[in-house]
C-alpha cells in the first residue's frame, strides 16, 4: 500500500442505494467512491477485488483517502473516482459470479453510477425511473454476452452501442417495447457488423489511392494499439506516470478500430489493387482483411 497515493477527504457522504449505503467523498473537486462498502454490498470477495484494484491502480486511479468510515472512526479507505466506477463494475462478468449475487451485481452495473452522479451534481440521489425489471432485461443481457464473446469487446463498449442507438444512459431506461428491438439490433451486429447491416450494397465512391491512405491510417492505429499494450507492463513496473495512458490507449480504442475496419472493408470491396493509383501498402491491406493485430508477449 506504500505506493498508493493518500488523500484527505473534504466532505464524505453516505448515499442510499438499493436499500444499502455507498460511502463517497469529495477531494479537490473530484467525487470518489469507497470500494470496500460497494464490494461488500454486492457480495463479492474483497480480497480478490482489492488485488485487482492494486494491480490496475493506474487504470482505476485507486487511492487511499483518510475519511470517516461506517463505524464513525477515521481511517484510510481505498477509493476510486466516481467516473471510474462503471469501468470497474463492468469488469466483472455477471455470468461468473455466484447466482445469489448476480442480480445485485447487475443492478449496480445498471443504476449505481447514475444515482451517485445525481447526488454529487444535483444534491440528491434519485434512482432512475424504472421502465423494465431485471428479468425483462435478461434477453438483452444474454445478447450482450454473445456480442462480447463473438466480437471480443469489453462490456462497457457493448453497452455503449445500445446507449447510443437508443439514446439512453443505461439499459434500465429502455421501455419494455424497446427490449426486443435492442436484442434484434445486437444480434444483427453479431451476425453482420454494425455498419453493414441489411442495407443494399452501395457503389464504392473512393478512389484506390484514397482507400489506400485510409487503410494505411487504420494500420497505424491498429499497430499503435499493440505497441501501447506492449509498453504497459514495463511502464507499470517502473511506476511511470504514463502507465495509465499506455493501458488506456492499448485497450479503449479497440472497439473504434474494429468499427473502422468494418467501414473500410465495406467501402473498399470494389477497389482494384492493380489500378495505377491503387494501394501501395499491400501488407496493411492484408492486415485489414485478416483483422490481424501484431502478437503480444503478454496476456491481458
Curated annotation (Swiss-Prot):
Keyword hit for Metal-binding: no
A Pfam entry, by short name: P22_AR_N
Key words of the record: Transcription, Transcription regulation
InterPro entries documented for this protein: Antirepressor_Ant_N, Phage_P22_antirepressor_C
Keyword NADP attached: no
Task of the protein: This protein prevents the prophage P22 c2 repressor protein from binding to its operators and also inhibits the action of other prophage repressor proteins, including those of phages lambda and 434. The synthesis of antirepressor is negatively regulated by the protein products of the two other immI genes, mnt and arc.
Name of the protein: Antirepressor protein ant
Source species of the chain: Salmonella phage P22 (Bacteriophage P22)
Name of the gene encoding the protein in the UniProt record: ant
Amino acid at each position: 500500500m506504500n505506493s498508493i497515493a493518500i488523500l484527505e477527504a473534504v466532505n464524505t457522504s453516505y448515499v442510499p442505494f438499493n436499500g444499502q449505503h455507498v460511502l463517497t467523498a469529495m477531494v479537490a473537486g473530484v467525487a470518489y467512491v469507497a470500494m470496500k462498502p460497494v464490494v461488500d454490498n454486492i457480495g463479492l470477495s474483497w480480497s480478490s477485488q482489492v488485488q485487482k484494484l492494486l494491480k490496475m491502480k493506474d487504470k482505476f486511479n485507486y487511492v487511499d483517502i483518510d475519511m470517516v468510515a461506517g463505524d464513525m472512526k477515521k481511517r484510510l479507505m481505498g477509493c476510486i473516482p466516481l467516473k471510474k466506477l462503471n469501468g470497474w463494475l463492468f469488469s466483472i462478468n455477471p455470468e461468473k459470479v455466484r447466482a445469489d449475487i448476480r442480480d445485485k451485481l447487475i443492478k449496480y452495473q445498471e443504476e449505481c453510477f447514475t444515482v451517485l452522479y445525481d447526488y454529487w451534481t444535483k444534491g440528491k440521489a434519485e434512482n432512475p425511473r424504472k421502465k423494465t425489471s431485471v428479468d425483462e432485461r435478461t434477453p438483452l443481457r444474454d445478447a450482450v454476452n454473445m456480442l462480447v464473446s463473438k466480437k471480443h469487446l469489453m462490456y462497457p463498449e457493448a453497452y455503449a452501442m445500445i446507449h447510443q442507438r437508443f439514446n439512453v444512459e443505461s439499459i434500465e431506461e429502455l421501455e419494455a417495447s424497446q427490449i426486443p428491438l435492442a436484442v434484434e439490433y445486437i444480434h444483427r451486429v453479431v451476425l453482420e457488423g454494425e455498419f453493414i447491416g441489411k442495407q443494399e450494397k452501395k457503389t464504392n465512391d473512393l478512389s484506390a489511392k484514397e482507400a489506400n491512405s485510409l487503410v494505411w491510417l487504420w494500420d497505424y492505429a491498429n499497430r499503435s494499439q499493440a505497441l501501447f499494450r506492449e509498453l504497459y507492463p514495463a511502464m507499470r513496473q517502473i511506476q511511470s506516470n504514463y502507465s495509465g495512458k499506455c493501458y488506456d490507449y492499448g485497450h479503449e480504442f479497440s472497439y473504434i478500430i474494429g468499427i473502422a475496419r468494418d467501414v473500410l472493408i465495406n467501402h473498399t470491396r470494389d477497389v482494384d489493387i492493380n489500378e495505377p493509383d491503387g494501394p501501395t501498402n499491400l501488407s496493411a491491406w492484408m492486415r485489414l482483411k485478416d483483422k490481424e493485430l501484431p502478437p503480444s508477449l503478454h496476456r491481458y
